[in-house]
Amino acid sequence: MLVSYNWLKNYVNLDAVTPEELAAKITKSGIEVEGVEYIAEKNENIVVGYVETCEKHPDADKLNVTQVSVGEETLQIVCGAPNIAKGQKVAVAKPGAVLPGNMKIKKVKLRGVESNGMICSLQELGLEEKYIPTDIAEGIFVFPEDEDIEVGSKVDEWLNLTDAVLDLDVLANRPDALSMLGVAYEVAAVLDQPIELPTKNIDYIDEKVSDQIEINIESKDLNPYYAAFMVKDVVIKPSPLWMRNYLMASGIRPINNIVDITNYVLLEYGQPLHAFDFDRFASNQIVIRRGVEGEVIQTLDEQERKLTEDNLVITNGSEPVALAGVMGGANSEVTDKTVNVLLEAAYFEATAVRHTVRQTGLRSESSTRFEKGIDPNRIVEAGLRACQLMQRYAGGKVLQGFAEENHLDTKSTKEVKVPLTQVNQRLGMELTEKDVQSVLNRLKFDFDQDGHTFIVHVPTRRRDITIFEDMLEEIIRIHGYDHLPYTIPQGWVKSGGLTDKQLLQRKIREFMMSSGAMETLTYSLTNEQNVKRLVTPNIDLENSYPISLAMPMSEDHKYLRLSIVPELLRILQHNIARKQTDLNYFEIGKVFISEEQELTHQPTEKLHLAGAFTGLWHNHPWQQDKKQVDFFVVKGIIEGLFNYLQLNISFKQVKMKDMHPGRCAELNIDGENIGFMGQLHPKTANVFDLPETYVFEIDLESVFEKYINVPSFTDIPRYPSVSRDIAFILDTEVFSGEVQQYIQEIGAPLVKEVSIFDVYQGEHLEDGKKSVAYRLMYQDPAKTLQDDEVESSYQQIVEAVNKKFGSYVRS
């Protein structure tokens, strides 16, 4: 938003601050000023001159010799502008003047004729060409004849050349600051000054707008309010000089008085207006409706636009005359021949305007304000202000009242309760009631008091204020952030560090990487096919509902995941398709669980560890061969992890969908299920185009509960250990892990560790049988074990296992 400092002075007294000081104060209060630029440097030697005579140069066809009065003297100036003529008032740079670009004006001779200055164009005075009206862009600038311009006076005074323009970076939550009055309210509050609002004195003729035009809103959801004003017998001509100056300073090119007035009021009130040539309207009806598929309108930029049902259009009952809130149509535009003006002031919903802007690529000052939101209580005010200016500067006759259709609550204001105790508690200050009253009065907010609580009636122009915290921000920014007391932190200052949970995550991550697995980071989003696939058994799928996104990036990223494994499988699939075969991945990430089909509460988030392995595995010294990943490799990784964490993990065979029926186990700590591991079912592997693949997933939240981050001390064994190997012939239905656990129980306390080192099925064994070899480690912490003690325990274990599982020892 470009804000003219001189224009702003019409509403607020700025005598006490320079433009730079004002910019600093506004920025400090919360609206950033990105820069302050002056239109041109102040120059005492550029004055208004009157061309007394204009004659052809005796020795140059394209030059003229003029005698120009500049008040106290008359200067002879040679001028080459094609539009120079006797009787004009022009801008004269006298000798000694310095124009933009460091152009120094001196007395010179041009083709033998002395020239004592320069008659200037607006560009030469420092104005940007893109903002200069097209009718005066070429040649020198000539002051309008109907302006009472004093010869010899400073040009700065008439062309606003010394004006400073503040470039405001207005955030999306402050659309009120996209108008001069909105900025004036802000500045008045910051400087603690009164604000002077425009007056609207209008002499009406004895005709009513409601007798001339009828309004019918068909799309009330997109256009809840529409008002029409009418001004007759206008004279199209250039705008007054002061208005053109303000528009150019604000970055808008002046066109003619009617169009300029609508733009001026747009900038002043923040309310977009549109002027129609009523005589070209071809109807006394205004119908606001959705566009018809294939319908065409030619807009003011002379482009034909094809409409859809998503476009909101203004029509005369039969054909579109404007794209609502974006741009008018060429079939009803104001021209030099316009006599009667129909003026639109409306409230268009942001969604309707935004869609048309995206479709057409047309973005304007009007559409920007509709997209960000306008003040419903300024709609009629802005319309009346435009009628007043058209009466004064276009000689128009204003009809009484206005036609409207209203489905908008334009009067309601929000009430926000502001308890003084909470204000002081939040700010850490001791503000008094008078302090808060002062801030509210400076903001021009009406309020009541109930004891020490302020009931603030927030004006509709401040759409950003809805709750107590919003008012708290207003209080401190107007009272001044520099008044906040400096408070030294009290109590012990604890140095930063990782939490126990973060430390455990780090330990798990370090172990997995040292085991040879690579860490991945996948999307937390998945598709409908995978969202309930391979979920840990401790999640109740019957009562858990996948959480879907309202606006997903794609169908592959529509649901929050319940399991990490499916995304790891997709990574395996991606890499195998690129000829990578030995893949070992793990990930620590969150899964999301909801017990509600319609989400009304925050879902439960759990941290999980997952892994996926295929191909060859190698985490041994470099000289050893790699081995094929199998069930026991993955089981060994998990056992190693929990040994590292000093937690006892047990495995129990389980059947899970998408997992191999004989090679899947659930993981338990102290009888509590925390996850699963095993081989992917061949059918599931085929879905992902994978070879034999093993996966696991562990609920780390359960692990955190069991984990105690205090190292336990165990004496170094003083006496040697003894190992014995034993191979049992078991039925294939018997779980090797169950036998392992049973041996541990029977052999206690002498048997310290039992491990499986070989499994065999095939030749030399009966059908339905398997050979499982176990290694038993014996140790007594108090003495050296004797052979007979070990042998006795060994035989006891053999007899117990054979009896329980129907096995026999392999010879």
Curated annotation (Swiss-Prot):
A GO CC annotation recorded here is: phenylalanine-tRNA ligase complex
InterPro entries, sorted: aa-tRNA-synth_II/BPL/LPL (IPR045864), B3/B4_tRNA-bd (IPR005146), DNA-bd_dom_put_sf (IPR009061), Fdx_antiC-bd (IPR005121), Fdx_antiC-bd_sf (IPR036690), NA-bd_OB-fold (IPR012340), Phe-tRNA-ligase_IIc_bsu (IPR045060), Phe-tRNA-ligase_IIc_bsu_bact (IPR004532)
Q: Give the UniProt record's GO annotations in the biological process aspect.
A: phenylalanyl-tRNA aminoacylation
Identify the residues that bind Mg(2+).
Answer: 464, 470, 473-474
Tell me the cofactor note. Binds 2 magnesium ions per tetramer.
Every copy of the tRNA-binding domain together lies at 40-156
Cite the FDX-ACB domain residue spans from the record.
717-810
Query: What's the Enzyme Commission number for this chain?
Result: 6.1.1.20
* Alphabetical list of SUPFAM superfamilies matching this protein: Anticodon-binding domain of PheRS, Class II aaRS and biotin synthetases, Nucleic acid-binding proteins, PheT/TilS domain, Putative DNA-binding domain
What does the record give as the reaction this protein catalyses?
Answer: tRNA(Phe) + L-phenylalanine + ATP = L-phenylalanyl-tRNA(Phe) + AMP + diphosphate + H(+)
Q: Where in the cell is it found?
A: Cytoplasm
Keywords associated with the record: Aminoacyl-tRNA synthetase, ATP-binding, Cytoplasm, Ligase, Magnesium, Metal-binding, Nucleotide-binding, Protein biosynthesis, RNA-binding, tRNA-binding
Q: Which SMART domains match?
A: B3_4, B5, FDX-ACB
Coiled-coil regions in this chain?
none
Report the residue ranges that make up the B5 domain in this protein. 411-486
- Record has Aminoacyl-tRNA synthetase as a keyword: yes
Query: Which EC class does it fall in?
Result: ligase
Signal peptide: which range, if any? none
GO molecular function terms attached to this record: ATP binding; catalytic activity, acting on a protein; magnesium ion binding; phenylalanine-tRNA ligase activity; transferase activity; tRNA binding
According to its UniProt record, which cofactors does this protein need?
Answer: Mg(2+)
What family does the database annotate? Belongs to the phenylalanyl-tRNA synthetase beta subunit family. Type 1 subfamily.
Enumerate the PANTHER family for this protein: PHENYLALANINE--TRNA LIGASE BETA SUBUNIT, PHENYLALANYL-TRNA SYNTHETASE BETA CHAIN AND LEUCINE-RICH REPEAT-CONTAINING PROTEIN 47
Q: How does it assemble?
A: Tetramer of two alpha and two beta subunits.
Name of the protein described by the UniProt record? Phenylalanine--tRNA ligase beta subunit
Q: Which species is listed as the source? A: Oceanobacillus iheyensis (strain DSM 14371 / CIP 107618 / JCM 11309 / KCTC 3954 / HTE831)
Give the source lineage, highest ranks first: Bacteria, Bacillati, Bacillota, Bacilli, Bacillales
